[in-house]
Design a protein with these regions (language model features):
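Glycine-anchored helix-breaking recognition loops at helix->coil/strand junctions
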Residues: 88, 95-103, 115-147
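Short, tandemly repeated low-complexity microdomains enriched for cysteine and small residues
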Residues: 56-59, 127-133, 167-178
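A short beta-sheet element
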Residues: 55-113, 117
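Intrinsically disordered, low-complexity regulatory regions enriched in Ser/Pro/Gly/Thr
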Residues: 36, 66, 133-135
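General detector of folded, globular domains
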Residues: 17, 43-44, 73-76, 85-87, ...
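Non-catalytic DNA-recognition/assembly elements of restriction-modification systems
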Residues: 1-31, 35-51, 149-214
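Structured beta-strand/turn binding interfaces of compact recognition modules in eukaryotic regulators
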Residues: 47, 77, 145
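Sequence-level motif detector for i,i+2 pairs with an aromatic at +2
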Residues: 12, 38-41, 69, 90, ...
Length: 214
């Protein structure tokens, strides 16, 4: 496993979004109504779950809507998501006015994940009435670990994230092995037609609320 300093052993400093990225571009999609399901690129929405991933779509109908990957996507507007940042490794489609993408030649997948997480710590500042756009976006500051020259330590951020990935993988593998032992090597899950079935009222399963108007 990679050996890397603890977070609290590193020196940190504040950096603005404007200073971190060589380019910040608006995403190019115009309307989700014209997206067609496919397997070309992901649609990255202004969302707070699944790293913004909504679904896979075709790029053939609107190739001009595709943004380059290896970028950090800024959620500028959205239902509880404004102020979040997502690292996106591959080309994608985002909706203009809702997201923007930042590019930095030094960015890698691991350092991108690290920086996106740090930027997302500003989420509480932004909302529908206080969007993450214009000067508010460019002047947003985030704390990052620095190297001996006082610059963002991309090498450290990459190694730290990789170590976290490896640590989580070990935990998942240990859990999977334990579950196999608990279940027994020859355990079988019954087929659907081998289970007993019965009818239930929807109200027995869900709490149903009726909402009238606004």
């Amino acid at each position: 496993m990679i050996t890397v300093k603890r977070i609290d052993e590193k020196d940190w400093d504040a950096f603005t979004v404007e200073s971190l990225f060589d380019e910040i571009k608006a995403t190019k999609g115009q309307t989700t109504g014209q997206l067609i399901n496919g397997d070309d690129v992901p649609y990255i929405a202004a969302a707070k779950t699944n790293n913004g991933f909504a679904y896979m779509c075709s790029a053939k109908e609107h190739p001009e809507w595709v943004s380059n990957g290896n970028t950090i996507v800024f959620v500028q507007l959205g239902d509880g998501a404004a102020g979040l940042a997502h690292y996106i490794p591959m080309d994608f489609i985002g909706m203009n006015g809702k997201t923007a993408s930042g590019y930095n030649a030094k960015l890698s997948e691991n350092s991108g994940v690290f920086i996106a997480r740090c930027l997302s710590s500003n989420k509480a500042i932004f909302s529908h009435g206080h969007s993450w756009t214009g000067r508010r976006l460019l002047s947003t500051k985030t704390m990052l670990p620095i190297n001996d020259d006082g610059e963002p330590d991309y090498d450290y951020m990459s190694k730290y994230t990789q170590k976290k990935r490896e640590s989580l993988l070990i935990k998942y593998q240990e859990y999977a092995r334990k579950r196999v032992v608990d279940l027994g090597e020859n355990s079988e899950i019954p087929k659907m037609d081998q289970k007993n079935w019965d009818a239930f009222l929807i109200s027995d399963i869900f709490n149903i609320c009726f909402i009238f108007g606004k």
